C-alpha cells in the first residue's frame, strides 16, 4: 500500500478528528469543517456498523502515526505477544518509533516532517546516526539533531511551535542543545484519551 500524499486536512475530515498531520497550534476546526466528511455528500454522515466503527478507529490511529497497513498489523501482532494490555502495548510501540519521538521532542513540526529528518540522516540516537523511522527508542536513549542539521530553519521553527504545546512527561528536552532523553515508556494515561484502542483489539481479534 502506497503512502498517502494528498491533502492532510482531508484525512482529518475523513476521521472526524484532528490527526495532527499539519503543523501549527491553531485548532484544525478553524480551518475546515472537521465534523463533516470530505466529498459531495459529506454532510450526510453514514451510520456505521460495529465493524465500521472499529475500522475507522484503526484507520485513525494508523494515520496519526503515519504507519502503513502491513506495518500496523505487525505492531498489533507484537503488542499481542507482549505481557499486559494489548491495546496499551500497541500505543506504546507506536510512541516508541523514532519519528514519533523526534516529533514529541519538538524537532519536527509534524510526524511526517520528523520522518523526513530521520530518513535524511539528521537524527542521532546515543551519538550514532539512525535513518530508520520505525527504530524503537528505548528508555534513557538520547535523541539529538546532527550538528550540520541544527541550522535548518524548519528545525528551529518546529522547536518554537513545540513551546506552545504540552510537554510530554516521559521526555526530557534541551531545546538549546537540540537533544532529548526518552526517560521512560509512556503509560496509557499519558496518551490521548481520544483514541479507543479497544476497538482496534476487537477488530483484529475477529
Swiss-Prot record:
Gene3D superfamilies linked: Ribosomal Protein S4 Delta 41, Chain A, domain 1 (1.10.1050.10), RNA-binding S4 domain (3.10.290.10)
Molecular function terms, GO-annotated: rRNA binding; structural constituent of ribosome
Domain called S4 RNA-binding: residue spans: 96-156
Ribonucleoprotein listed as a keyword: yes
Matching InterPro entries: Ribosomal_uS4, Ribosomal_uS4_bac-type, Ribosomal_uS4_CS, Ribosomal_uS4_N, S4_RNA-bd, S4_RNA-bd_sf
GO BP annotation list: ribosomal small subunit biogenesis; translation
Classification via SUPFAM superfamilies: Alpha-L RNA-binding motif
Keywords: Ribonucleoprotein, Ribosomal protein, RNA-binding, rRNA-binding
Any single Gene Ontology cellular-component annotation: small ribosomal subunit
Signal peptide feature range: none
Membership in a protein family: Belongs to the universal ribosomal protein uS4 family.
Function field: One of the primary rRNA binding proteins, it binds directly to 16S rRNA where it nucleates assembly of the body of the 30S subunit. With S5 and S12 plays an important role in translational accuracy.
Protein name: Small ribosomal subunit protein uS4
Species this protein is from: Yersinia pestis
Gene: rpsD
